[in-house]
């Protein structure tokens, strides 16, 4: 317990000094900095090599903490009460007197907010008097990190500190919902659309509009191991690592499985770690069998399609 507290104090000290710190969340590890500080936020973009045109998600401890930055509405309250803390990001109207750095929003009048479900990061957020902007702790368009080791692999000693929270429990980024304009899903993520629709009592769909509001994780190439990926494969070619949805007997070392019994929640949790493992084993190509395109399978397929773009 004392070690945990000392780590949180160290993270707080560095964040107070406008440094970037990697933090654990239930989705993926984030590269965090003071969302009110231009200096700190610019360090995120530099470290990640991320375009400044791509807005950041801001992390808060609880709903009460966002009242100075955003305008709340009834849909937010319904979804917050059901899913938060958890893997859901809300697009809300930014208040004029908010202290949020202009670099977080790219000058937009909206803000993406989230309430992460992780014990260590929850304690850290409670100790701060500002929220944390925290995109995934990886180089832009690369595989998202789901452990402390993954972050080290990405950045080495370029990050001041990594707050260890074990492996991410969800392993997929948050679902993003727009609550400012017409209510719609802007990014598929760790909460299924059907579950959100049930709470709001309306049918929601994933918005694929070309000119929609820019949100994280929507570039054509993203979540990539920098290895060619062949989707919906029935069997691998000789030079390919092969990812299976379910564990089977009798396969050699170039076969990797996401689940033991086709559980899509487990498959989502293991997706990025499997891609990273294959990359670290120096395979030159990846084939993956067809993933069911329903529930969390929609999110998994979205990530794989973007990762396979060349």
Residue ranges and their predicted role:
Residues 1-310:
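Active-site-adjacent structural elements in enzyme catalytic cores
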């Amino acid at each position: 317990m004392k070690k945990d507290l000392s780590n949180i104090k160290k993270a707080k000290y560095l964040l107070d000094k406008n440094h970037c710190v990697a933090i654990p969340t239930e989705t993926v590890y984030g590269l965090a900095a003071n969302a009110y500080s231009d200096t700190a936020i610019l360090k995120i973009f530099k470290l990640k090599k991320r375009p400044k045109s791509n807005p950041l998600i801001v992390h808060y401890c609880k709903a009460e903490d966002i009242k100075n930055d955003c305008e709340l509405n009834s849909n937010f309250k319904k979804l917050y009460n059901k899913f938060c803390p958890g893997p859901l990001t809300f697009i809300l109207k930014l208040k004029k007197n908010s202290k949020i750095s202009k670099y977080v929003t790219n000058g937009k009048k909206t803000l993406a907010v989230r309430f992460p479900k992780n014990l260590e990061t929850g304690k850290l957020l409670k100790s701060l008097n500002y929220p944390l902007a925290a995109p995934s702790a990886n180089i832009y368009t690369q595989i998202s990190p789901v452990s402390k080791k993954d972050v080290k692999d990405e950045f080495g000693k370029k990050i001041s500190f990594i707050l260890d929270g074990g492996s991410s429990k969800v392993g997929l980024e948050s679902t993003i919902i727009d609550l400012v304009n017409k209510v719609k899903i802007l990014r598929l993520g760790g909460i299924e659309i059907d579950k959100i629709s049930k709470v709001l009592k309306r049918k929601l769909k994933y918005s694929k509009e070309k000119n929609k509001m820019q949100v994280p994780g929507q570039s054509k190439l993203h979540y990539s191991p920098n290895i060619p990926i062949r989707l919906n494969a029935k069997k691998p070619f000789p030079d390919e690592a092969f990812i299976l949805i379910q564990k089977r007997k009798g396969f050699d070392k170039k076969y990797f499985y996401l689940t033991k019994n086709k559980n899509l929640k487990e498959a989502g949790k293991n997706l990025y770690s499997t891609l990273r493992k294959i990359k670290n084993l120096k395979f030159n190509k990846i084939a993956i069998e067809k993933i069911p395109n329903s529930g969390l399978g929609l999110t998994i397929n979205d990530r794989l399609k973007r990762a396979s773009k060349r």
